[in-house]
From Swiss-Prot:
It comes from Danio rerio (Zebrafish). It is found in: Cytoplasm; Cell membrane, Sarcolemma; Cell membrane, Sarcolemma, T-tubule. SUPFAM superfamilies: Cysteine-rich domain, SH3-domain. Residues 7-17, 191-210 have a biased composition (Basic and acidic residues). This is SH3 and cysteine-rich domain-containing protein 3. Residues 217-276, 277-334 form the SH3 domain. A zinc finger (Phorbol-ester/DAG-type) spans 62-113. Keywords: Cell membrane, Cytoplasm, Membrane, Metal-binding, Repeat, SH3 domain, Zinc, Zinc-finger. SMART domains: C1, SH3. Disruption phenotype: The mutants mi34 that do not express the protein exhibit altered motor behavior most probably due to a defect in the coupling between the electrophysiological activation and the muscular response. The nervous system, the neuromuscular junction or the skeletal muscles seem normal. Residues 1-26, 178-215 are annotated as: Disordered. GO terms for cellular component: cytoplasmic side of plasma membrane; cytosol; T-tubule; voltage-gated calcium channel complex.
């Protein structure tokens, strides 16, 4: 085996005996070797671009904050944390009523104040949702689309409500004048007793319509369920148990009613219709009912309408939204 290995070693060629010359080597006749390298080109560094001038943010409508004592727990419109300190002092905007901590004042210095907000649509315009306006100065002068939509909707609703009530009132006045003009004519024709067949049919139809109108007007009335304090000048102020005459029910939410000599608008959910023969009761003490037994829970001074006879000391009553049994000894008839 050793002989075969020696023969193989003689025939083999080692790369280290005659290594290949690299490409960048130049060899002359006197065995002088030169290495050739590419010339390095130094790249000139471009001067850095000039730094842009910082955008100076100007707030044309800043908040007007003043020290405010919070009698009730309030939440900061910036950090959404409760304003609870020993003295409960906070900063409150004079116009938009925004409440913030003293430490959060720097976060709203570039926010615009939206001014006074109509009652019923007060929103936190200085909440963190509006912090994006600080990063985008081009959109600082944009108004809130939700607020504009609500404001236009309220204005249009008030116009339609007043316009509909005026049209309804004019139509009722015209109908009353026509009925008054037709009534003496019918009396004279009835006294003479000389009417044709067509006139008799017409008179009978008119009398029937009048009887139906009288029956409809006397078939029900409306009773106040809750206390409603007038918000606007044309609203009707009433207390629970007041009897209300409805003049206009064309609107789905606000009706026009009358109590004595006072007229105005009222929310239709605050009243209940009472039909002829139904009795109205007032709750004298709060009671928690059992739903499994068909009982309802009512609070003191609530107004209910009787809907059934007494069974085992319980009356079936209705509040307009709920219907069930209630102890008869806790009800006082109005």
């Amino acid at each position: 085996m050793a002989q075969y290995d020696q023969l193989e070693d003689k025939d083999s060629l080692d790369i280290h005996d005659n290594p290949p010359a690299p490409e960048n080597v130049v060899k002359e006749d006197d065995n002088t070797v030169y290495f050739v390298y590419d010339e390095e080109v130094e790249e000139e560094e471009a001067p850095p671009p000039p730094t842009p001038e910082p955008i100076v943010q100007v707030n044309d409508k800043p908040h007007k904050f003043k020290d405010h004592y919070c009698k009730k727990p309030k939440f900061c419109d910036v950090c959404a944390r409760m304003i609870v300190l020993n003295n409960k002092f906070a900063l409150r905007c004079k116009n938009c009523k925004t409440n913030i901590h003293h430490s959060c004042q720097s976060y709203v210095q570039f926010q615009r104040c939206f001014g006074k907000i109509p009652p019923g649509f007060r929103r936190a315009y200085s909440s963190p949702l509006y912090d994006q306006e600080i990063n985008n100065p081009g959109q600082q002068n944009r108004t809130d689309p939700v607020f504009d939509t609500l404001r236009v909707g309220v204005i249009m609703a008030n116009k339609e409500r007043k316009k509909g009530s005026e049209d309804k009132k004019n139509m009722m006045m015209m109908m009353m004048e026509e009925e008054e003009a037709q009534q003496p004519k019918e009396d004279e024709e009835g006294a003479e007793g000389k009417q044709d067949g067509d006139k008799k049919d017409k008179t009978a139809t008119d009398d029937k319509n009048k009887k139906q109108q009288q029956t409809f007007s006397q078939s029900h009335y409306y009773m106040a369920l809750y206390r409603f304090k007038a918000i606007e000048k044309d609203d009707l102020d009433f207390h629970p148990g007041d009897r209300i005459t409805v003049l206009d029910d064309s609107n789905e939410e606000w009706w026009r009613g009358k109590i004595g000599e006072k007229t105005g608008y009222l929310p239709m959910t605050y009243i209940i219709r009472v039909r002829a023969g139904e009795r109205v009761y007032k709750v004298t003490r709060s009671f928690v009912g059992n739903r499994e037994m068909g009982q309802i829970t009512l609070k003191k001074d609530q107004i209910v309408v009787k809907k059934g006879e007494e069974v085992n000391g319980y009356l079936k009553v209705s509040t307009g939204r709920k219907l069930g049994f209630f102890p008869a000894d806790l009800l006082h008839e109005l």
